[in-house]
Amino acid sequence: MKHFLLFIFLFSISLVSHAQNETQKLALLNSAKYFEIKSRANYTQAILKAKENGWPIRYKSKNNASVNLVGIDAFGQPKYLTTFADPIQAITINTNKVWPGGGLGFNLTGATDIMTNKLSIWDEGVPRPTHVEFGGKVVEKDNATKIVSHSTHVAGIMFSKGSNQLAKGMAYGIKGAYSYDWFDDESEMAAAAANGLLVSNHSYGNVAGWNFNDDSTRWEYNGKWNEKEDFKFGYYDDGAQAMDSIAFNASNYLIVKSAGNSRTSTGPKVGDTYWRRDENGKWYDAGKRPDSLSSNNAYETLPMDVNAKNILTVGAVQGIAAGYSKKEDAIMTSFSSWGPTDDGRIKPDIVTDGQSVYSTTNNNDSS
C-alpha cells in the first residue's frame, strides 16, 4: 500500500509553523493522557483475553506482513494491526517537480530549520538508525528497539538523502525526524501535535475481513461470528474518532494513513477450509467456505480508523514512469482498498504509486 504522500508534505515545508493556541494545546495534552490510559488498560485486557481464547499476540500473514495484537474492539473482539506494503515514488506523485531543478521554482527539500523534527513516522518498529541514507536523522521517541525492514523502507521513501539516487526520499534534505512504534499511537500523536508536529505517516492499519495466517497456514475470517461481511469495513470506530479529535485540535497537523490492501486478500476458494471465531471469540475450524461470505474485493473495503474525516487517506495506483499528465495514466492496483465509507463519504482522498517501489531495507547500512 501507499506509504507516503507527498506533494502535501513538501507543500507544508513552505508553511510557517504557527504554534497551537493554549486552548488547543491543553486539549491535545489532555487527550494524550486520556488515550494513554485507555490504550494501556485496553491492551492489558486484550492480553488476558488472548490467554483465555488462544489469540496469537503476533504472527505473520501473507507477503510476510507483520500482525500484532494491540487491543480489543467495542464488541470484545481482538484488534490487530498489520503493515501495509509498498510506498510511493517521486515521479508518479510529481514531488520531483518541487525539488531544485524541478521546473516549478520551489526548490523544496525539507532542509529548512523550521522542518527539523516536524515530520514523524509511526510504524511496526524502528528504521535502521545507522543506514547511510538517513543515519543520524531519525530520533526514536518511545523507546522502541526492534529494527524493522518495513519501518526502514518507509523511512527511506520519506527522507533518504539520495546516496543512491534511485532511492532518494521525498524530503531528502530534512535534518531530523521522529520515529515511534505503533503501540499507543493515538496518545503519542496527540502529544507530538501539541509540541508542533506537522506531518505523520502511518503505513499500517486494522486487520479486517479475510487474512491468511502464515504461522498457522490457514485462511481466517475476521468478521463477527454471525455475519457474512466484516462490519469493520467502512466503519467509523473509536480510532477514527480519535484521529479526528487530534486533527481538529491541531489544525496545522496532517495525519497520513494508508488505505489498506484488502482487495486481494479474498479468502480461500468456496468449498475450501477456513477458520473463524465463535461468539466467545475463540478460533475454530469452520469447515468449508460457503459462497455467501464476502470476499472483500470490491467497494467499501477501508478498515476502521482509515475512515476518519480529517486525515489524508492514500490509495495505490500503478507506477507512472513518465509522470502523471492525464487521468488515463492512473491505473488502480489490484490490492488497494476502496471506499466509500458507511456514511457515504468518498475515500481514499488521493492515490499515488504504491507498487514495487525501490527503497531502503534493514539488511545492512547500505541496502
For every predicted segment, state its role:
Residues M1-L26:
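Bacterial Sec-dependent N-terminal signal peptides
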Residues A27-S31, E36-I121, V139-I147, D184-D185, ...:
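N-terminal domain-start motif of subtilase-like serine proteases
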Residues N96, N222-G223, K326:
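Flexible, solvent-exposed coil segments and beta strand-coil junctions
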Residues T109-A111, A240, S258-K309, G315-K347, ...:
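Active-site-adjacent substrate-recognition loops and nearby beta-strands
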